[in-house]
């Protein structure tokens, strides 16, 4: 079962890079920090290489909801501290998965983790969700869809199999993030 393969970070580390909500470290960096005025090429190169490396190490039990939430959990402060800014920043949680979510805890618990990290900003108003996901998750109200709709605005999504829509979905998600930044901050 899934629980045989799942150890939440609150019960100790499984020592796997990028597991349990910890950032995937690539090239000595757990995430790439940049400014909108910087040359985008280094970010693109780092992200492309990190995504390929992470994809090759993944498991068939995909738990993106747990991963997105445990990023904000205090148990992951040693690797993730400083990644989520509470004040003056909108958080875009973007899912890129070709499998339905298999995270074991209830959606309400995962939602609370992210809300706790964005209290000063305004909670729901400062968290947006988007993603390239399997088309089935909405229709069956799968856990991933429940999580993506648990925050303020409707998620921006596209079918992971429709590669032609990738740019449009990412562009809309980034535009919504910038729009919300102007509205709420």
Task: Label each PLM-derived region with a short phrase.
Residues 1-185:
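Divalent cation-coordinating acidic motifs and surrounding scaffolds
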């Amino acid at each position: 079962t899934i629980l045989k393969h799942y150890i939440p970070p609150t019960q100790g580390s499984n020592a796997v890079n990028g597991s349990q909500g910890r950032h995937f470290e690539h090239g000595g960096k757990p995430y790439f920090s940049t400014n909108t005025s910087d040359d985008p090429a280094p970010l693109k190169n780092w992200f492309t290489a990190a995504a390929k490396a992470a994809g090759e190490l993944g498991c068939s039990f995909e738990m993106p909801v747990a991963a997105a939430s445990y990023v904000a959990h205090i148990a992951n402060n040693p690797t993730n501290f400083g990644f989520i800014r509470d004040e003056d920043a909108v958080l875009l949680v973007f899912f890129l998965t070709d499998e339905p979510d298999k995270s074991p805890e209830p959606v309400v618990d995962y939602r609370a983790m992210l809300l706790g990290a964005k209290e000063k900003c305004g909670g729901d108003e400062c968290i947006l969700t988007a993603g390239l996901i399997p088309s089935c998750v909405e229709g069956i109200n799968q856990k991933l869809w429940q999580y993506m709709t648990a925050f303020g605005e409707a998620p921006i999504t596209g079918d992971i199999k429709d590669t032609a829509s990738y740019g449009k979905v990412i562009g809309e998600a980034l535009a919504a993030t910038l729009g919300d930044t102007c509205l709420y901050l």
